[in-house]
Amino acid sequence: MMKENKELMAEARASLSGNWGLAVGTFLVYIIIVGTLQVIPVIGGVIGLFIAGPMSVGICMFTLSLSRDENARLEQIFEGFKNYGTVLGAYLLMVVFIFLWALLLIIPGIIAAIAYSQTFYILAEDDTIGSMDALKKSKEMMDGYKWKYFCLGLRFIGWALLCILTLGIGFLWLSPYIQISYAKFYEDIKAA
């Protein structure tokens, strides 16, 4: 039986209890690395293309560890580089597929992004799976759960608006909360 989104969010808050400092610090390092590259014209975007996927897998490893009450460590955000070829391949394929679907209209692009949303969690757990297989598995896992995932994301819009009022500082706390909630979602659909 699938849990309600509010239950997943409550579980995420429980996982973050006592771990907020680690979570905020880890996301701050992630944001500094990825964000700094995005502000460097041209070359930053190119370099960012090659590190965003592995860093995202690392964030998934970190959030899954926190979600499971395991030993989460800041260094986990760099563990996506251990399986670099597969992770980069999956990231580039996701970018291309989502872009192609978005060319049709915005809605198909959003649906494609949601369908592939579990790819990095799959790669975080299984470093033997190939890029295309991870994308296919994500698409299969999300079959019947896309709306639930979309609604989970919508629950954070109010919080995001409040974070804007803090000149973005609130996102240091909101980002881990959102990502742990998505990790809980992954665990829930994996068990379903």
Could you describe each region identified by the protein language model?
Residues M1-A192:
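Hydrophobic alpha-helical membrane segments
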